[in-house]
Curated annotation (Swiss-Prot):
Known function: Associates with the EF-Tu.GDP complex and induces the exchange of GDP to GTP. It remains bound to the aminoacyl-tRNA.EF-Tu.GTP complex up to the GTP hydrolysis stage on the ribosome.
Organism: Bradyrhizobium diazoefficiens (strain JCM 10833 / BCRC 13528 / IAM 13628 / NBRC 14792 / USDA 110)
CDD domains: UBA_EF-Ts
Name of the protein in its database record: Elongation factor Ts
NCBIfam families according to UniProt: tsf
MF GO annotations: translation elongation factor activity
Sorted UniProt keywords: Cytoplasm, Elongation factor, Protein biosynthesis
Family the entry assigns: Belongs to the EF-Ts family.
Subcellular location: Cytoplasm
Domain of life: Bacteria
Keyword Glycosyltransferase: no
Example GO BP: translational elongation
Involved in Mg(2+) ion dislocation from EF-Tu: annotated span: 80-83
Keyword Nucleus carried by entry: no
Length: 307
């Protein structure tokens, strides 16, 4: 058997764009034959997948799955919205959500987990090779309670449990599971619409709160208000801010005459026990990803060899 050197792995990686470990495996499987190793990578779709991995993937689907006291939400990105309507891609997202439910929300653990004899990472690469677009498991999150429910809501669903936005909400309660699930779904819909930053003021980033205080204070200093008056105005302004960005203090979208906290308290009678919102996660597709702008005319010119 030929000795596989670092230089050989480097050369194969440069010629195919495949990962280092994949290149080493390809050379080992093919007794150091470079051309055979390249073909091996192509057959497995790894060379093609790696070449596409540099392209921006900002579309795709959010997958959400909840069962009883546990729930997960995942984001799987593709390059175009068209792929989100592809049955293979949709199945991949649902499979990833199930694996995340089983092994936890660590992205690397999810990618290493196997479904049958195939890892999730391999399944993603196979889909890239088949569909022809870059894809990536971007992030995952999970919530769990000791008693109660975790509910979910998917906005813009293209299939059950997958769409353009996904929310999971955890409710701790000894109450009736069916009533809790219904309440949890209502709150998840609220989170999707209202986009709270935290459950309550204590969960806000101190830097965000400081920035808000500074903006308010500077505004009234420019108006010539004395410092003792500014302090009171800022405190009042912060209370208004909390009502805008903290879930428990927001006006409930299903009944704007009460806050989310009040709505939850009023639901306790129907639920049959005290209810506490233990947490929530809201994923909107592509948030924070800078999408690539394309010049269609330039692409056509490039394809035809013109400048």
């Amino acid at each position: 058997m030929a000795t596989i050197t670092a230089a050989m792995v480097k050369d194969l990686r440069e010629s195919t764009g495949a990962g280092m470990m994949d290149c080493k495996a390809a050379l080992t499987e093919n007794d150091g034959n470079m051309e055979a190793a390249q073909d091996w990578l192509r057959k497995k779709g790894l060379s093609k997948a790696a070449k596409k991995s540099g392209r921006v993937a900002a579309e795709g689907l959010i997958g959400a799955l909840t069962k009883g006291t546990k729930g997960v939400v995942v984001e799987v990105n593709s390059e175009t919205d068209f792929v989100a309507r592809n049955g293979q891609f949709q199945g991949l997202v649902k499979m990833i959500a199930q694996v995340a439910f089983d092994v936890g929300a660590d992205v690397e653990k999810i990618k290493a987990a196997k479904v049958g004899d195939v890892t999730i990472e391999t399944a993603i690469n196979d889909a890239i090779a088949t569909i022809g677009e870059n894809m990536t498991l971007r992030r995952a999150a999970s919530l769990e309670v000791s008693q109660g429910v975790v509910s979910h809501y998917v906005h813009g669903a293209v299939i059950d449990g997958a769409g353009k936005m996904g929310v999971i909400v955890a409710l701790e309660s000894p109450g009736k599971a069916d009533e809790l699930a219904a309440l949890g779904r209502q709150i998840a819909m609220h989170v999707a619409a209202a986009n709270p930053l935290a459950l309550d003021p204590s969960g806000l980033d101190p830097a965000v709160v400081k920035r808000e205080k500074d903006v308010l204070a500077d505004k009234y200093r420019q108006q010539g208000k004395p410092e003792n008056v500014i302090e009171k105005i800022v405190e009042s302004g912060l209370k208004t801010y909390y009502k805008e960005v903290c879930l428990l203090e927001q006006a409930f979208i299903h009944d704007t005459g009460k806050s989310v906290a009040q709505a939850v308290k009023e639901a306790e009678g129907k639920v049959g026990g005290a209810v506490k919102i233990a947490g929530f996660v809201r994923y909107a597709l592509g948030e924070g990803i800078e999408k690539q702008e394309s010049d269609f005319a330039a692409e056509v010119a490039a394809a035809s060899g013109k400048k």
